């Protein structure tokens, strides 16, 4: 499999914004923490045959580095400190941190090393896997087909929103990790830029080159790692929320709620956190139920929900986003992050349902017990039981 050996990636910034935001926080607070992460294909795709091609791409990634113009652009953003950016200038991907193999047809990938370095592998590696697989499966598919599909969806979207006040509707591109290709994502984002309700992208490379706002705060791994960083498991989620505010006291204030279910999150999300964080992000479970819980929680704490933002990002498409907007727009600020349904929405192309998730921190297990049982990941059943007990979740379904 060498016919497509040219590198998929061309920029270190071709990744999700929250990876750099988290990396800076890890650089400042957890420099010596080590982690391990593993690849999962949630579908039935046998991707092992692509292992050699993916391994080639992993090797090519060691040549990526922060360019001078990229460094200058990051320096002008309010999020980053000079010590981190100077370190990032010297950063190089280390392929020795990645093992890729074909396990009886299944693609097996494991990452391990210092968290400050390993943290950057996930998004570009998933984008590489997605693009390599689609290159082989759909060699005749091109950007025009993706754009035609989007134009058709935008016509439907206009009809769906006719007569609706869309002034509070905000859409973001979250499509890097499962995109059909880098070229498709850029084309889709350029088209969406023409719409007044499109507010930005999670992709730092596209944000820089297209003069867009980079969007993103933190991911599940921030909360998962704290399960072992925090000396008290029951306090680990609060420790993660507090450490984030230490790094970003006045910005990047959207908290992810489903590392250990929304109910457990809200028990930890008291009035100080709820006041200081700008809002919450939904990534699993029923979105209407979740949003109602969030609004009720703010009201219970005496906080006006209209002063907060709910971000929906779980398996969204334009139609679902409009339904949620109709339901919630009069009561709370809203943003919608759409990924796969924008950047891999092409007839006859099956998007990959692939993830890379943290499984260990400092040699000990971590877990994600989300509001969608199929998204649960952990090897260690005893640790899952301990986590359920610590967060008073006796009925959570077992880890898969």
Swiss-Prot record:
The gene designation is pncB
Q: Which reaction does it catalyse?
A: nicotinate + 5-phospho-alpha-D-ribose 1-diphosphate + ATP + H2O = nicotinate beta-D-ribonucleotide + ADP + phosphate + diphosphate
Q: In which pathway does it act?
A: Cofactor biosynthesis; NAD(+) biosynthesis; nicotinate D-ribonucleotide from nicotinate: step 1/1
Q: EC top class, in one word?
A: ligase
What's the protein name? Answer: Nicotinate phosphoribosyltransferase
Q: Which species is the source of this protein?
A: Escherichia coli (strain SMS-3-5 / SECEC)
Please give the CDD domains that the UniProt record associates with this protein.
PncB_like (cd01401)
Q: Which residues carry this modification: Phosphohistidine?
A: 220
Record keywords: Ligase, Phosphoprotein, Pyridine nucleotide biosynthesis
| GO terms of molecular function | nicotinate phosphoribosyltransferase activity
Give the InterPro entries listed for this entry: N/Namide_PRibTrfase, NAPRTase_N, Nic_PRibTrfase, Nic_PRibTrfase-Fam, Nicotinate_pribotase-like_C
């Amino acid at each position: 499999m060498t016919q497509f050996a040219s590198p998929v990636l061309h920029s270190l910034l071709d990744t999700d914004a929250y990876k750099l935001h988290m990396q800076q926080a890890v650089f400042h607070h957890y420099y010596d923490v080590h982690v391990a992460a593993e690849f999962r294909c949630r579908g039935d795709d046998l991707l092992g045959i692509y292992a050699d091609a993916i391994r080639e791409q992993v090797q090519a990634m060691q040549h990526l580095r922060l360019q001078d113009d990229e460094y200058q652009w990051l320096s002008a953003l309010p999020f980053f400190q000079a010590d981190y950016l100077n370190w990032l200038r010297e950063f190089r991907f280390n392929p020795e941190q990645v093992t890729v193999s074909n396990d009886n047809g299944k693609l097996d990938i494991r990452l391990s090393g210092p968290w400050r370095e390993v943290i950057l592998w996930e998004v570009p590696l998933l984008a590489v896997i997605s693009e390599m697989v689609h290159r082989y499966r759909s060699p005749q598919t091109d950007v025009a087909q993706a754009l035609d599909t989007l134009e058709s969806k935008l016509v439907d979207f206009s009809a769906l929103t006719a007569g609706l006040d869309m002034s509070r509707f905000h859409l973001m591109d979250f499509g890097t990790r499962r995109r059909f290709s880098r070229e498709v994502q850029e084309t889709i984002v350029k088209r969406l830029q023409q719409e007044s309700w499109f507010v930005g992208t999670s992709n730092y490379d596209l944000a820089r080159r297209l003069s867009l706002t980079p969007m993103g705060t933190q991911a599940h791994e921030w909360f998962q790692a704290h399960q072992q960083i925090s000396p008290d498991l029951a306090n680990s989620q609060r420790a993660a929320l507090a450490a984030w505010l230490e790094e970003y006291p006045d910005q990047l204030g959207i908290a992810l709620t489903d590392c250990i279910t929304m109910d457990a999150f809200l028990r930890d999300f008291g009035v100080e956190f709820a006041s200081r964080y700008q809002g919450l992000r939904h990534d699993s479970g029923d979105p209407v139920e979740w949003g109602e819980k969030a609004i009720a929680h703010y009201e219970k704490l005496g906080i006006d929900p209209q002063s907060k933002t709910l971000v929906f990002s779980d398996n969204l498409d334009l139609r679902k986003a409009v339904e949620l907007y109709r339901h919630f727009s009069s009561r709370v600020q809203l943003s919608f992050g759409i990924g796969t349904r924008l950047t891999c929405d092409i007839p006859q192309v099956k998007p990959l349902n692939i993830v890379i998730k943290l499984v260990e921190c400092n040699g000990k297990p971590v877990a994600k017990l989300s509001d969608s049982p199929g998204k649960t990941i952990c090897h260690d059943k005893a640790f899952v039981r301990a986590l359920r007990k610590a967060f008073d979740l006796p009925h959570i379904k077992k880890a898969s």
